[in-house]
Amino acid sequence: NEVQYSYEYLFKNILGNNSKNNNLRLWTQNEIKDDVYINYQNLLNDDGFKIFLKKLYNLGFCVITNCETKLETVEIIANKIGYVRQSIFGGLWEFESNEDMADSAYTQEELRPHTDSTYSNDAPGLQLLLCCDYKASGGESIMVDGYNIGKTMKNNNKDLFDILSNIDVPGKYIGDGVILEAKRPIFKLDKKELVQVSFNNYDRSEFRIEEKATNKFYEAIKKFDELANSDKFQWRHVLKPGELLIFNNWRILHGRGSFKGKRKMAGCYVNMEDFRSACKIHGVN
């Protein structure tokens, strides 16, 4: 058999730079403003949906405005990307503050920036959060570019970056009839390229590391947490009813300011492989 390939194809797929992160836009707070917003109606046509995917791929998150404040809206958006992922919390979910739940998201307290499901071997790729009702004060949603934290630490604290790239950190969830455990580095690398950030002090489990590495590990954790909680790296916004926040859980750390009052949310997860598939189908890379 004989197969012919164009030079352009060979260069792009074999000879060229195949970095997964070539077109990502790493950001700090003062570098993104209105870039993150897109109207829900724009998602309903192919051109608008591609623009949405580009925002989500490049920045790691975006806010969809003018959504209907019902659970079905979350499902419609998830199904345009892939499908709703089932988890211990169900597929689609609605929630208000609830102290009886084991998960920290159900409280009114401040949530420091973290990624979800560090206790899962395959953490959700995307998370969708729709604000259905807000009669409260506070409760800002917080986004942090974990890839940019990785780049910053690699450039300025290479020894600490290496620690967080090589030590597996365990996560554990106990509740709702399950015990889930998994472990991976905070900075997961593939051929020296950062492909996933996993950081959650709420779900981190006990573990042992070599005594000589203990102090350095906690120094690295402290530096990561300092950067994630500095104003420079945080984008903050109080979600209004009808606004849906969607973000890449393998890249973006999310948090929430403390609040008082009523705040009702709806949401779901989508698998990373389905997000990547949608991007490839629409030529987003």
Identify the meaning behind each predicted range.
Residues 1-24:
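Hydrophobic, ordered structural segments
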Residues 24-61, 66-285:
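Active-site environment of non-heme Fe oxygenases that use a 2-His-1-carboxylate facial triad
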